[in-house]
Amino acid sequence: MYCTPNLLEKWAKYTVDINKNYIRKNSYDFHLITKPFDASVTHAWQKIPAMLMLFQENKYEYVMYIDTDAIFYDQTIKIEDIINKYQGDIIVCSDEANSAGKYKVNGGALIVKNTPAAIELLIRWWELRNEYKEFAFEQWALSDIVENKIDGIDGSIISVAPETEFNSVYNEVQTYANDTSKPPPNRFVHHFMAMDDKTREHVFSKLYDELVPENDRQYLISAGK
Protein backbone atom coordinates (compact mmCIF):
# COMPACT_ATOMS: atom_id res chain seq x y z
CA MET A 1 0.00 0.00 0.00
CA TYR A 2 1.02 3.59 -0.59
CA CYS A 3 -0.50 6.16 1.77
CA THR A 4 0.30 9.77 2.52
CA PRO A 5 0.92 10.34 6.27
CA ASN A 6 -1.96 12.80 6.67
CA LEU A 7 -4.48 10.10 5.76
CA LEU A 8 -3.12 7.77 8.44
CA GLU A 9 -4.44 10.29 10.96
CA LYS A 10 -7.88 9.94 9.39
CA TRP A 11 -9.71 7.00 7.81
CA ALA A 12 -6.63 5.27 6.41
CA LYS A 13 -5.73 3.90 9.84
CA TYR A 14 -8.74 1.62 9.44
CA THR A 15 -7.95 0.44 5.94
CA VAL A 16 -4.32 -0.25 6.78
CA ASP A 17 -5.40 -2.31 9.79
CA ILE A 18 -8.07 -4.24 7.87
CA ASN A 19 -5.60 -5.08 5.14
CA LYS A 20 -2.77 -5.83 7.53
CA ASN A 21 -5.04 -8.23 9.40
CA TYR A 22 -5.87 -10.06 6.15
CA ILE A 23 -2.18 -10.25 5.26
CA ARG A 24 -1.25 -11.56 8.71
CA LYS A 25 -3.91 -14.28 8.60
CA ASN A 26 -2.63 -15.50 5.25
CA SER A 27 1.08 -15.28 6.09
CA TYR A 28 1.86 -12.73 3.38
CA ASP A 29 4.24 -9.80 3.77
CA PHE A 30 2.75 -6.33 4.17
CA HIS A 31 4.49 -3.14 3.06
CA LEU A 32 3.19 0.35 3.78
CA ILE A 33 4.97 3.11 1.84
CA THR A 34 4.41 6.69 3.05
CA LYS A 35 7.13 8.70 1.28
CA PRO A 36 6.79 9.61 -2.41
CA PHE A 37 9.41 8.46 -4.87
CA ASP A 38 8.74 11.52 -7.04
CA ALA A 39 6.92 14.32 -5.24
CA SER A 40 6.41 16.22 -8.49
CA VAL A 41 3.62 13.84 -9.54
CA THR A 42 0.41 12.82 -7.81
CA HIS A 43 0.31 10.04 -5.23
CA ALA A 44 -1.45 7.71 -7.67
CA TRP A 45 1.82 7.18 -9.55
CA GLN A 46 3.83 6.14 -6.48
CA LYS A 47 2.60 2.53 -6.55
CA ILE A 48 4.80 1.78 -9.56
CA PRO A 49 8.23 2.52 -8.03
CA ALA A 50 7.00 0.92 -4.80
CA MET A 51 6.47 -2.36 -6.63
CA LEU A 52 9.75 -2.01 -8.50
CA MET A 53 11.54 -1.50 -5.19
CA LEU A 54 10.12 -4.75 -3.83
CA PHE A 55 11.09 -6.66 -6.95
CA GLN A 56 14.67 -5.39 -6.62
CA GLU A 57 14.96 -7.51 -3.48
CA ASN A 58 14.25 -10.56 -5.68
CA LYS A 59 12.30 -12.00 -2.75
CA TYR A 60 8.83 -12.14 -4.23
CA GLU A 61 7.33 -14.12 -7.09
CA TYR A 62 4.28 -11.84 -7.02
CA VAL A 63 3.46 -8.43 -5.58
CA MET A 64 -0.11 -7.21 -5.11
CA TYR A 65 -0.75 -3.49 -4.75
CA ILE A 66 -3.98 -2.13 -3.26
CA ASP A 67 -5.04 1.51 -2.90
CA THR A 68 -5.49 3.09 0.52
CA ASP A 69 -9.24 3.44 -0.08
CA ALA A 70 -9.65 -0.28 -0.80
CA ILE A 71 -9.92 -3.19 1.62
CA PHE A 72 -9.87 -6.98 1.56
CA TYR A 73 -13.46 -7.80 2.54
CA ASP A 74 -14.03 -11.52 1.93
CA GLN A 75 -10.93 -12.64 3.77
CA THR A 76 -11.46 -16.33 2.96
CA ILE A 77 -10.24 -15.66 -0.59
CA LYS A 78 -6.51 -15.89 -1.20
CA ILE A 79 -4.50 -13.86 -3.69
CA GLU A 80 -3.38 -17.17 -5.22
CA ASP A 81 -7.02 -17.88 -6.11
CA ILE A 82 -6.94 -14.86 -8.42
CA ILE A 83 -3.50 -15.61 -9.82
CA ASN A 84 -4.55 -19.13 -10.77
CA LYS A 85 -7.46 -17.83 -12.86
CA TYR A 86 -5.48 -15.55 -15.18
CA GLN A 87 -2.49 -16.04 -17.47
CA GLY A 88 -1.05 -12.52 -17.66
CA ASP A 89 2.12 -11.41 -15.91
CA ILE A 90 0.06 -8.44 -14.72
CA ILE A 91 -3.55 -8.80 -13.58
CA VAL A 92 -5.78 -5.77 -13.19
CA CYS A 93 -9.53 -5.19 -13.10
CA SER A 94 -11.68 -3.44 -15.67
CA ASP A 95 -12.97 0.08 -15.06
CA GLU A 96 -15.34 0.22 -17.99
CA ALA A 97 -18.49 -0.01 -15.85
CA ASN A 98 -17.27 2.87 -13.68
CA SER A 99 -16.04 5.14 -16.46
CA ALA A 100 -18.65 4.44 -19.16
CA GLY A 101 -15.93 2.75 -21.17
CA LYS A 102 -13.46 5.64 -21.03
CA TYR A 103 -10.82 3.67 -19.09
CA LYS A 104 -10.18 0.00 -19.76
CA VAL A 105 -8.71 -0.70 -16.32
CA ASN A 106 -8.73 0.58 -12.75
CA GLY A 107 -5.35 1.18 -11.13
CA GLY A 108 -6.61 0.75 -7.57
CA ALA A 109 -5.45 -2.86 -7.29
CA LEU A 110 -3.14 -4.96 -9.40
CA ILE A 111 -1.12 -8.15 -9.16
CA VAL A 112 2.29 -8.32 -10.82
CA LYS A 113 4.48 -11.36 -11.40
CA ASN A 114 8.26 -11.08 -11.08
CA THR A 115 9.16 -11.55 -14.75
CA PRO A 116 11.44 -9.48 -17.01
CA ALA A 117 8.47 -8.53 -19.18
CA ALA A 118 6.38 -7.31 -16.24
CA ILE A 119 9.25 -5.34 -14.72
CA GLU A 120 10.00 -3.74 -18.08
CA LEU A 121 6.35 -2.74 -18.40
CA LEU A 122 6.38 -1.20 -14.92
CA ILE A 123 9.50 0.79 -15.81
CA ARG A 124 7.98 2.04 -19.06
CA TRP A 125 4.68 2.84 -17.32
CA TRP A 126 6.54 4.89 -14.68
CA GLU A 127 8.36 6.79 -17.44
CA LEU A 128 4.98 8.08 -18.63
CA ARG A 129 4.29 10.00 -15.40
CA ASN A 130 5.07 13.41 -16.89
CA GLU A 131 2.89 12.75 -19.93
CA TYR A 132 -0.29 11.82 -18.03
CA LYS A 133 -0.65 14.68 -15.55
CA GLU A 134 -4.43 14.94 -15.72
CA PHE A 135 -7.04 12.61 -14.25
CA ALA A 136 -6.96 9.58 -14.32
CA PHE A 137 -3.15 9.80 -14.29
CA GLU A 138 -1.49 6.36 -14.12
CA GLN A 139 -4.82 4.62 -14.74
CA TRP A 140 -5.26 6.49 -18.00
CA ALA A 141 -1.72 5.54 -19.01
CA LEU A 142 -2.27 1.88 -18.13
CA SER A 143 -5.52 1.85 -20.08
CA ASP A 144 -3.63 3.12 -23.12
CA ILE A 145 -1.01 0.41 -22.59
CA VAL A 146 -3.72 -2.27 -22.44
CA GLU A 147 -5.12 -0.98 -25.72
CA ASN A 148 -1.61 -0.97 -27.24
CA LYS A 149 -1.79 2.75 -27.94
CA ILE A 150 1.80 3.40 -26.83
CA ASP A 151 4.62 2.39 -29.14
CA GLY A 152 7.16 0.03 -27.64
CA ILE A 153 5.05 -1.16 -24.69
CA ASP A 154 3.52 -4.62 -25.02
CA GLY A 155 0.14 -4.62 -23.31
CA SER A 156 -0.53 -8.25 -24.19
CA ILE A 157 1.02 -9.44 -20.91
CA ILE A 158 -1.84 -7.80 -18.98
CA SER A 159 -4.93 -9.83 -18.07
CA VAL A 160 -8.04 -7.73 -17.43
CA ALA A 161 -10.45 -9.25 -14.90
CA PRO A 162 -14.04 -8.14 -14.24
CA GLU A 163 -14.48 -5.14 -11.94
CA THR A 164 -15.62 -7.26 -8.99
CA GLU A 165 -12.78 -9.82 -9.14
CA PHE A 166 -10.55 -7.74 -6.86
CA ASN A 167 -11.81 -4.17 -7.28
CA SER A 168 -15.30 -2.65 -7.35
CA VAL A 169 -18.27 -1.42 -9.30
CA TYR A 170 -18.81 2.08 -7.96
CA ASN A 171 -22.58 1.73 -7.61
CA GLU A 172 -22.11 -1.20 -5.21
CA VAL A 173 -19.79 0.61 -2.82
CA GLN A 174 -21.83 3.80 -3.08
CA THR A 175 -24.98 1.89 -2.10
CA TYR A 176 -23.23 0.55 0.99
CA ALA A 177 -21.80 3.97 1.87
CA ASN A 178 -25.32 5.41 1.75
CA ASP A 179 -26.68 2.74 4.11
CA THR A 180 -24.15 0.87 6.23
CA SER A 181 -26.90 -0.88 8.20
CA LYS A 182 -26.94 -3.49 5.44
CA PRO A 183 -23.80 -5.47 4.61
CA PRO A 184 -22.00 -4.84 1.32
CA PRO A 185 -21.87 -7.58 -1.33
CA ASN A 186 -19.54 -10.41 -0.37
CA ARG A 187 -16.63 -9.46 -2.63
CA PHE A 188 -12.92 -10.12 -2.21
CA VAL A 189 -12.08 -6.41 -2.41
CA HIS A 190 -14.17 -3.29 -1.95
CA HIS A 191 -12.70 -0.09 -3.39
CA PHE A 192 -14.40 3.06 -2.07
CA MET A 193 -13.18 5.30 -4.86
CA ALA A 194 -14.19 8.93 -5.40
CA MET A 195 -15.62 9.54 -1.91
CA ASP A 196 -14.93 12.31 0.59
CA ASP A 197 -13.07 11.90 3.87
CA LYS A 198 -16.21 12.02 6.02
CA THR A 199 -17.85 9.20 4.06
CA ARG A 200 -14.70 7.08 4.12
CA GLU A 201 -14.25 7.62 7.86
CA HIS A 202 -17.79 6.35 8.48
CA VAL A 203 -17.54 3.41 6.08
CA PHE A 204 -14.11 2.18 7.10
CA SER A 205 -14.68 2.48 10.85
CA LYS A 206 -17.80 0.35 10.38
CA LEU A 207 -15.94 -2.24 8.30
CA TYR A 208 -13.07 -2.24 10.79
CA ASP A 209 -15.46 -3.22 13.58
CA GLU A 210 -16.85 -5.99 11.38
CA LEU A 211 -13.59 -7.41 10.03
CA VAL A 212 -10.99 -7.02 12.76
CA PRO A 213 -11.69 -8.98 15.98
CA GLU A 214 -10.79 -7.13 19.16
CA ASN A 215 -8.21 -9.72 20.18
CA ASP A 216 -6.36 -9.17 16.88
CA ARG A 217 -6.12 -5.40 17.17
CA GLN A 218 -2.97 -5.54 19.28
CA TYR A 219 -1.02 -6.38 16.11
CA LEU A 220 -2.22 -3.37 14.18
CA ILE A 221 -1.13 0.23 13.81
CA SER A 222 -4.28 1.74 15.36
CA ALA A 223 -3.46 -0.04 18.64
CA GLY A 224 -0.78 2.58 19.22
CA LYS A 225 -2.88 5.57 18.28
Where are these regions (language model features)?
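N-terminal anchoring/stem segment of glycosyltransferases
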Residues: 1-61, 116, 216-218
